[in-house]
Amino acid sequence: MRTLFLLRGAPGAGKSTFIRNNNLENYTLSPDMIRTMVQCPVMNTKGEYSISCHNDGYVWNTLMEILERKMQRGETVFIDATHYRAALLNSYNKLIKKYRYRAFIVDFTDIPLEQCLKNNRNRDRYKWVPEETIRKMYACFTYSKEVACKFKIISRDECIKMLDPISCLF
């Protein structure tokens, strides 16, 4: 299908839940998943376990290497990440052109901030994201709309309608 779906929204917006509820795990790359593969949750300064971001360079390089291998085979791929910064969205352009992919942003930025914060509080404790971080990321979506416009932005329902049941056997 040669399609790349970039999920975009604040932590707690429901991106991973969307993937799980639609049985898309086998088609999904997630920096959070790679982070926990590289390092188990660690105790922070507050005495709570959390996922470390100290390996993010390695995590994103690994994600991009796996993505390229999938794109070489023409696979449909979902990236489950916040994509709150323009640089993150732009990092896919080279591969999109090289492998002649269609790319879409699956928009979760319409989820209210309060809902994101509530969902975050209901996560396993080690997966919590500090509320201040969520608020900062949420504010970034307003300022990076112009970059997101380089990609076609689609709703979650539009995304599901686009999936070809023959090429995505789920």
Predicted regions and their residues:
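ATP-dependent NMP and nucleoside kinases share a basic, alpha-helical "lid"
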Residues: 37, 41-42, 71, 83-126, ...
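Amphipathic alpha-helical transducer elements in NTP-driven molecular machines
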Residues: 53-64, 86, 131-138
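Conserved GTP-binding G-domain of TRAFAC-class P-loop NTPases and closely related GTPase folds
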Residues: 2-8, 13-16, 21, 25-27, ...
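Conserved substrate/cofactor phosphate-moiety recognition/catalytic segment
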Residues: 16-75, 115-117
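Short, well-ordered coil/turn elements that cap or connect secondary structure elements
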Residues: 23-24, 72, 98-100, 148
